[in-house]
Amino acid sequence: MLFIQCRLIMRKILILFAVALIGFASCADSKQSITITVTNPLALERVGEMVEVPMSDVVAKLKLADTAQIVVLDVDGQQMPYQVTYDEKVVFPATVEANGTTVYTIQPGTPAPFDVVACGKYYPERLDDVAWENNLGGFRAYGPALQARGERGFGYDLFTKYNTTEPILESLYAEELNPEKRAKIAELKKTDPKAASELQNAISYHIDHGYGMDCYAVGPTLGAGVAALMAGDTIIYPYCYRTQEILDNGPLRFTVKLEFNPLVVRGDSNVVETRVISLDAGSYLNKTVVSYTNLKEAMPVTTGLVLREPDGAVVADAANGYITYVDPTTDRSGANGKIFVGAAFPAQVKEAKVVLLSEKEKKDRGGADGHVLAISEYEPGSEYTYYWGSAWDKAAIKTPDAWNKYMAEYAQKLRTPLAVAY
């Protein structure tokens, strides 16, 4: 009898053990994860640099349902901000020491709310501007309504930013375009021009009210880094965009697709340019991918920074893949500080140089002195990728040397990207 009781007890223990194993396996499945190993091959620390993992790989490895959510964890198990982009990539900021490796984890879970850092908007009420920003600065491209008025704004414009890391452009536009205040200004101009001017300055985004401003001049130039085809030594200037589509709008990446009216290139009047521009949180530079449809032959393509002083501080370094310029801003007294502009290139640049304009050309280019250009070769059917952007000496980057160091290191990082394995 005792033997039978012992057998029954052992059987119950085995059943309980089997149930426990099944429960453990089920728990393990619920915590299934992907280990993301990020390796930095450079002797430079990489801080907050976006890495990308295809969402399709995440779904396949985690066997996720369509409605499932994920979290990205650092080595301490703390959640990282991330974004799933329009082209189905999980992007998140990685920090990796020089010649080092950092491990992150992706697993099913409910993500914490993240602050929106990179974002933008289409402003039909401001002549079709598309304006976007991150924690470091803002940018804009001009649209068809501006072109229809006959204004010539070919290049990218800039908004400086300091004293905040939060989005400011929407509030700047709202104040600049406030209809009640605009009506009041129009009324005051008839009776009290001084008061009208004071109110105009109070709402203008061309005046610094403590968080930044637009004090950059563009006009009929390449502005802060537009790319253009070249016929010999002649730049074929693009005009304002024709259509826009915002593809990503934060929290970590803003992406917009711009398509342009046909260009006349060597007698062909049907060459259409498309740009896809992306700005990531924590970066001074926008990634831009340019393509030209209906182009029949290889041509030089250049990225340019407009020069507003012929003897301004310029770096044109083709070998190391970057160009920079110190812009005096629209106020040459120095009250607005200096804007540092630059472009960096992941592929080899054929030539980088300063090209000054003749007196006649200056008049046609709104008084600009010239451009610093980085020239490459564009093959029909390909994509031309480069990065452009700016910093302000009233914010974190104070000197031309600091900006040139940032740009040189950025170009190095483009040519030696982080390695992502999983």
Where do the model's predicted regions map?
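Beta-strand-rich recognition/accessory modules
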Residues: 89, 96, 345-422
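Solvent-exposed N-terminal domain segments of exported/luminal and surface proteins
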Residues: 110-233
